[in-house]
């Protein structure tokens, strides 16, 4: 049986505290036909040392560099250029995934002839202990995603051929903008499992000014990038804010 190759794209920037766990959560997958593409974005800590130690032991790991520190969008775009897989997924360097995630997600896609799927996820504390499960819609299309970003970057698995021309824009909330573009191409993403298989590490301090900046970034995506006009941009922004409030308060 042909085993599709899955490319996992991970930007790395000063991630020495949690990088090893994130990498091993990929390499220890029950589905082994993967390539892990690491893009260092100008790290000044021990991240490269950690990566080199792993590369010596596992040839599935590939390391690339940005010329200067350019942010996650540029790093992920290098990963998209270098990826050879039939399917693409992403992981941030301080997060991790369940060991059977890719096997279950890929099998679900192959059995149901799907191009793009997503899963539920959980927030964890800095030690990796689960704090809160976040559930997502069974089916997400472009209009659904406009009402609130239900994806975390590592929850999505998508057929590479279907998004081969897409890249992350160099803006804030670049992942949200990228997935909006994806859903213009593939039309919908389907939930493959109700269990959390992706784990997002969060800090213990939430800064109100960052929430205000995030709100501006989101509105700019609606108004400037999606060109929805003032009224529709305000409408979807209100839905986005409401759904975000509900998600974090449940």
From Swiss-Prot:
<dbReference type="GO" id="GO:0016757">
    <property type="term" value="F:glycosyltransferase activity"/>
</dbReference>
<dbReference type="InterPro" id="IPR001173">
    <property type="entry name" value="Glyco_trans_2-like"/>
</dbReference>
<keyword id="KW-0808">Transferase</keyword>
<dbReference type="InterPro" id="IPR029044">
    <property type="entry name" value="Nucleotide-diphossugar_trans"/>
</dbReference>
<dbReference type="GO" id="GO:0016758">
    <property type="term" value="F:hexosyltransferase activity"/>
</dbReference>
<comment type="similarity">
    <text>Belongs to the glycosyltransferase 2 family.</text>
</comment>
<dbReference type="GO" id="GO:0009058">
    <property type="term" value="P:biosynthetic process"/>
</dbReference>
<dbReference type="Pfam" id="PF00535">
    <property type="entry name" value="Glycos_transf_2"/>
</dbReference>
<keyword id="KW-0328">Glycosyltransferase</keyword>
<protein>
    <recommendedName>
        <fullName>Uncharacterized glycosyltransferase HI_0868</fullName>
        <ecNumber>2.4.-.-</ecNumber>
    </recommendedName>
</protein>
């Amino acid at each position: 049986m042909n085993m599709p190759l899955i490319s996992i794209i991970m930007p790395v920037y000063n991630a020495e505290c949690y990088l090893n766990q994130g990498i091993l959560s990929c390499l220890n997958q029950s589905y082994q036909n993967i390539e892990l593409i690491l893009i260092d974005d100008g790290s000044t800590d021990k991240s490269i040392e950690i990566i080199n130690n792993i590369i010596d032991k596992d040839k599935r790991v590939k390391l690339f560099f940005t010329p200067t520190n350019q942010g996650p969008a540029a790093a992920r775009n290098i990963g998209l250029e270098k990826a050879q897989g039939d399917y693409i997924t992403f992981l941030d360097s301080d997060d991790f995934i369940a060991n059977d995630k890719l096997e279950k997600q890929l099998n679900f896609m192959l059995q149901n002839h799907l191009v793009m799927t997503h899963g539920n996820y959980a927030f964890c504390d800095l030690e990796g202990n689960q704090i809160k499960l976040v559930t997502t819609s069974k089916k997400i299309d472009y209009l659904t995603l406009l009402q609130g970003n239900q994806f975390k970057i590592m929850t999505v698995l998508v057929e590479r051929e279907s998004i081969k021309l897409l890249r992350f824009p160099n803006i804030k909330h670049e992942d949200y903008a990228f997935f909006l573009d994806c859903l213009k191409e593939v039309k919908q993403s389907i939930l493959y499992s109700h269990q959390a298989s992706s784990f997002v590490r969060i800090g213990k301090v939430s800064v109100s000014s960052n929430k205000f900046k995030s709100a501006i970034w989101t509105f700019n995506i609606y108004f400037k990038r999606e060109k929805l006009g003032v009224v529709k941009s305000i409408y979807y922004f209100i839905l986005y804010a409401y759904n975000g409030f509900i998600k974090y308060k449940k």
